[in-house]
């Protein structure tokens, strides 16, 4: 995972690179991890039901070093992420 201020380059299992925009990041004290919500550049984030949103745990890079995306490992993690997502969507609806 390479990233700038608001973008990351995600490399899939086939070695294909895709530039993605970071929607938001957060940390979970319960799981001791950082998480990032992101979507492909070019997809407009106006309707979250129509935009493919990805989420991964991540280890930030230090200095010039690249960070690393990690898979979500448990059902409990997914439940926590879903709560964070629902809160984010509710806040967006209020704006």
UniProtKB/Swiss-Prot annotation:
Origin: domain of life: Bacteria
Query: Which first-to-last residue range defines the signal peptide?
Result: none
- Entry's Pfam families? DUF1292
Q: Tell me its family.
A: Belongs to the UPF0473 family.
Record-linked HAMAP family = UPF0473
Please identify the protein, giving its name as recorded: UPF0473 protein GWCH70_2487
């Amino acid at each position: 995972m390479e990233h700038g201020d608001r973008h990351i380059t995600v490399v899939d299992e086939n070695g294909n690179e895709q530039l993605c925009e970071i929607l938001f990041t957060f940390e979970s004290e319960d799981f001791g991890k950082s998480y990032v919500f992101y979507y492909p550049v070019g997809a407009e984030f106006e309707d979250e039901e129509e935009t493919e949103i990805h989420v991964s745990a991540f280890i930030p890079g230090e200095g010039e070093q690249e960070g690393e995306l990690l898979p979500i490992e448990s059902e409990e993690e997914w439940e926590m992420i879903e709560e964070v997502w629902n809160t984010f969507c509710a806040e967006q609806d209020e704006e």
